[in-house]
């Protein structure tokens, strides 16, 4: 990331928003195509990764879309591990766990060696440890989970009949526009949860600090669907306290590294 990435980002997005023309979407927000310069630059990041994707950036009620597959903005995909944000909110709000509780590793082999240890919810969020959040979902239970997902109006709100994998394989699906709006609401404490609960989860999402600005985000990788889908959803909190939500969505193809989502997002925020 360049030295002035976040300050430059905040200025450039203001310029692009003032110069763009609106198009119709399923969102109630005003949706805009970015300036030609930004569109070409960010499109090239997806092209270079040999994948198709979009990143949506929100300021106020204005949404700007960038990438080489803009139609993805309103298409539904499994949320994969981005659902950990809501999973944690629901679990903490309903006293199914605490931020200090240690989730014990059961000794079984996991997808990644880094998951093979005891973890708190915050540590599991940082490592995107699926088994920990599957256990949290089982504690919540199918009935309460469905009630809460509908109450928040997350995506298509359909969690099906199995409580511990609906965000990985479906039937729960969500659009990038809905994801960025969810991030916006969490960033500004507008979700229907206690302020304390939202603040606890937000602390788990801090992934980078640059020049006084912070990036809060959660990645997702839908490996069990075809084609595979990748996410990075969150917000930039500038030094002055202003928050700018974003959601990156792309197709994860063979040969794509785990870091491609962060790399494209960071470059797009320059």
Label the predicted regions.
Residues 68-74, 117-118, 126-133, 160-167, ...:
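Flexible glycine/proline-enriched surface loops and loop-helix/loop-strand junctions
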Residues 1-23:
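Sec-dependent N-terminal signal peptides of Gram-positive bacterial secreted proteins and lipoproteins
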Residues 23-75:
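Beta-lactamase-like hydrolase cores
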Residues 92-108, 193-198:
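Short, well-structured active-site flanking segments
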């Amino acid at each position: 990331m360049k030295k002035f990435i976040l300050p430059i980002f905040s200025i450039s997005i203001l310029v692009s928003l003032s110069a763009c023309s609106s198009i119709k979407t399923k969102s109630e927000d005003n949706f805009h195509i970015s300036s030609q310069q930004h569109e070409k630059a960010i499109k090239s990041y997806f092209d270079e990764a040999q994948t198709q994707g979009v990143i949506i950036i929100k300021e106020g009620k204005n949404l700007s879309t960038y990438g080489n597959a803009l139609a993805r903005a309103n298409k539904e995909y499994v949320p994969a591990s981005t659902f950990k944000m809501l999973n944690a909110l629901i679990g903490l709000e309903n006293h199914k766990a605490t931020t200090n509780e240690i989730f014990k590793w059961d000794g079984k082999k996991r997808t990644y060696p880094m998951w093979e240890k005891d973890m708190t919810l915050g540590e599991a969020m940082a490592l995107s440890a699926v088994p920990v959040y599957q256990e949290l979902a089982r504690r919540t239970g199918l009935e309460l989970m469905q009630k809460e997902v509908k109450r928040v109006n997350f995506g298509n709100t359909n969690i099906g009949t199995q409580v511990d994998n609906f965000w990985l394989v479906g039937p729960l699906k969500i659009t990038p526009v809905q994801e960025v709006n969810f991030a916006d609401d969490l960033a500004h404490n507008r979700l229907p949860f206690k302020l304390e609960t939202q603040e606890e989860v937000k602390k788990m999402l801090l992934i980078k600090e640059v020049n006084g600005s912070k990036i809060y985000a959660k990645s997702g990788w839908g490996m069990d669907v075809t084609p595979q889908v990748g996410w990075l959803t969150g917000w930039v909190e500038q030094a002055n306290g202003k928050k700018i939500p974003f959601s990156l969505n792309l197709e994860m193809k063979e040969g794509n590294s785990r870091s491609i989502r962060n790399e494209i997002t960071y470059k797009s925020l320059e």
